[in-house]
């Protein structure tokens, strides 16, 4: 059984094949670079309370 596995690109939602795709899980280099740019700009965040600002001292520093 040689079923072709297809997935949706996480960026543009276009159907793409998994096997033989050098940009997987993305459909193209463009979508891969858009996602990388979002990571670099800290566009992906976990929801929650903002972390307190550090005063430059780490716990245990005396």
Curated annotation (Swiss-Prot):
UniProtKB keywords: Metal-binding, Zinc
Region (Disordered): 43-62
Basic and acidic residues composition-biased segments: 43-52
Free-text cofactor note: Binds 1 zinc ion.
GO aspect biological process, one term: regulation of DNA-templated transcription
GO molecular function: zinc ion binding
Binding site for Zn(2+): 9, 12, 27, 31
InterPro entries linked to this entry: DNA_gyrase_inhibitor_YacG (IPR005584), Znf_NHR/GATA (IPR013088)
Cofactor(s) required for function per UniProt: Zn(2+)
Family: Belongs to the DNA gyrase inhibitor YacG family.
Function: Inhibits all the catalytic activities of DNA gyrase by preventing its interaction with DNA. Acts by binding directly to the C-terminal domain of GyrB, which probably disrupts DNA binding by the gyrase.
Oligomeric and partner information: Interacts with GyrB.
Protein name per the record: DNA gyrase inhibitor YacG
Species in which this protein is naturally found: Geobacter sp. (strain M21)
